Amino acid sequence: MPEPVLQSIPARLLSHTPLRSIVLALFLATPLAIAASPQNPPATLDSELFEVTVPQLESLYTSHAVTVTQVVEWHLARIRRFNPIYRAVQTVERKEALQQAATLDRQLASGHLPAWPARGLLWGVPIVTKANTSIADQITTDGWRGYMLPGHELLAPRDSTLVARLRAAGAVFLGITNMPDFAASDTNRSSAYGRTGNAYDVRFSPGGSSGGTVTAVTSNYAVLGNGTDTGNSIRMPSATSSVVGYFPTRGLVSIAGIAPLDWLLDNTGPIARNVTDAAIALSAMTGMTAADPAPKADPLDPRTADAAQKAQPGLYTQYLRPGALRGKRFGVPAFILLGSGIPFQGIPAVVPEKSAAEEEQDAVLPLRDSTRKAFLAALDGLRAAGATIVFDDSILPPTFARIVSRAGTMPYVAEGTDQFLKLFGPAQYHSVADYKRATGQPLPDTIVNPTLERKDEPKQSQMQIETDPAAQANYFRPRQLALDQYDATLDRLHLDGYVYPATQMPPPDETMPQSYAHTGGISGTISEGPHSDTSWVNILGVPAIVVPGGFYPNGLPFGLEISARRWRDGDLLGWAFAYEQVTHHRHPPTLVQQGLLPNMP
């Protein structure tokens, strides 16, 4: 297993340094697990491997221009060089990655390896995985120290379905990326491994909870990674870092073996530097192969049972056409422009109306002027590719947001945590109750009994959703009403999908106190942003994608989000590809090797 090397704050920084700088030092010098790697590979590989795509990499392998070992070592060297500053990767799997690379090199040298993609959609492709995604014999930290207690570690007994499918596709696992505790934050600070910085400016937030993966991928630590998304956690951080983040139709990709935040909302999907790589990775994540290009059901995730019948057929790369946007129509949701807001996890029907109204008001997220300008500018790329943008106050108005907000999932959270521990927990604990018996402390309410933000609101009783008589009123009925309105609006206005900003604000500077979004007051605390108004996608389970949409005046990225009807994932990827080919908005970050304070390690 990887051996972590811990770094602490240099004592010299604590004696003659202004308070603001000490706070920043705390961010930049929190514990981090990194492993030694060899000397940097020859610089001549930079031109071949920097920003390399999956098809380009496979071509290099086919022509024997590089070996898998060289490619893996090049990426490991970038992690060693830059990760101490950005802290995107919590654990490096150097030994395992090089062993796998050597095995693949022997296959390549044998002369009997099939051509790509028959040899595996991701054959020899370096990837990273998020810390809530189970890998056999590795600790699934879920970003939380409590799963790392000596003698009580959450050591995965087997791979998650996602990891098993990526292995089968030939991917090489380089490391595990940082994430906030339980994926329950809009930023990327973890009790287990500290803070991840934005690759475009380390002072700023990369967003969360997949901020570690997006920082690793945009920084060329790996070609691809996986993210998870309960309320925006693939899409929002992708927007901050000029990468492509994909939220599949729920049920297309299995979440079995991924530590849940809220199993009714959770999803997983690819994070990549371009749409083509995202489409290839998504195909692999569904269990597709070149010989059998159909999504596979996973017995451990019943929501995948009908994927093969409902999904668009074939590998998703076949939908990537430069002209895919011609004649398409996209509506802009009115409630997002108005900043109506949707409380995360919704509000169960059993919550009193007064408390529900107060919670809805607290969720208001005004769209910042700079984000509105960036969004309107990004729409020009859609128009240039042949699409029409429709603004209409009846397109998902604030009443839609209110319907969605009443699809409450909080009473059913513990059910998902229990199911995960039953199948992917260590020998010591296979349930919420087992964890308390084994460690002497309970699991936090976040994953066993969440409540509304208001401190005076009592916790909801945890129930099994299949047997709870209130489940229809709490969740199923409002979700279906919102989904019906989503589809009916598309039909009424002859729309193909929706387009909107992936966040309500630019990435915040985490070295400065932040203002509350809904009051304008100063909180005096570090950021919990950039905030997003896109958790409705999770409740509905429709597919959505974030693509690079340009940059703010300060040089930080803006992300454009597009959503489609359920199971139209191929169409959605095609639209994103067409937008990408017209705009070419992505520009990689310029990374630094020094901290923001003198002599920082």
Roles of regions detected by a PLM:
Residues 45, 116-118, 122-150, 327-359, ...:
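Short helix-loop capping/hinge segments that flank enzyme active sites or metal/cofactor-binding pockets
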Residues 18-33:
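Bacterial N-terminal signal peptides
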Residues 40-231, 249, 273, 285, ...:
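Gly/Ser-rich catalytic/binding loops embedded in alpha/beta enzyme cores
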Residues 145-148, 196-199, 209, 258-267, ...:
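Flexible glycine/proline-enriched surface loops and loop-helix/loop-strand junctions
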Residues 64, 124, 130, 168, ...:
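Glycine-rich, small-residue loops and helix-cap segments
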Residues 1-17:
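N-terminal secretory signal peptides that target proteins for export/translocation
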Residues 81, 172, 218-358, 376, ...:
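Structural helix-boundary/capping segments
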Residues 72-73, 102, 316, 365-394, ...:
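Acyltransferase
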